[in-house]
Amino acid sequence: MAKKSMIVKAAREPKFKVRGYTRCQICGRPHSVIRDFGICRVCFRKMANEGLIPGVRKSSW
């Protein structure tokens, strides 16, 4: 779980546009965020396994 202070800091508009970064909407994790869904890989995997993301299924070949 991300620190509350960092989540609040990331929510503010940065002074320069390039300083902005994505955070997971669920847990606040700053790394490995899947932009299409707005969540990190950990939350994505958990939600996909629970069937909460429509159209996503585990691949097998």
From Swiss-Prot:
Zn(2+) binds at residues 24, 27, 40, 43. Keywords: Metal-binding, Ribonucleoprotein, Ribosomal protein, RNA-binding, rRNA-binding, Zinc. Pfam families: Ribosomal_S14. It comes from the Bacteria. InterPro entries: Ribosomal_uS14, Ribosomal_uS14_bact, Ribosomal_uS14_CS, Ribosomal_uS14_sf. One of its GO terms (molecular function) is zinc ion binding. Binds 1 zinc ion per subunit. One of its GO terms (biological process) is translation. The keyword Cytoplasm does not apply. Its cofactor is Zn(2+). GO terms for cellular component: cytoplasm; small ribosomal subunit. Part of the 30S ribosomal subunit. Contacts proteins S3 and S10. Binds 16S rRNA, required for the assembly of 30S particles and may also be responsible for determining the conformation of the 16S rRNA at the A site. PANTHER family: 30S RIBOSOMAL PROTEIN S14, SMALL RIBOSOMAL SUBUNIT PROTEIN US14M. Belongs to the universal ribosomal protein uS14 family. Zinc-binding uS14 subfamily. This is Small ribosomal subunit protein uS14. The gene is rpsZ.
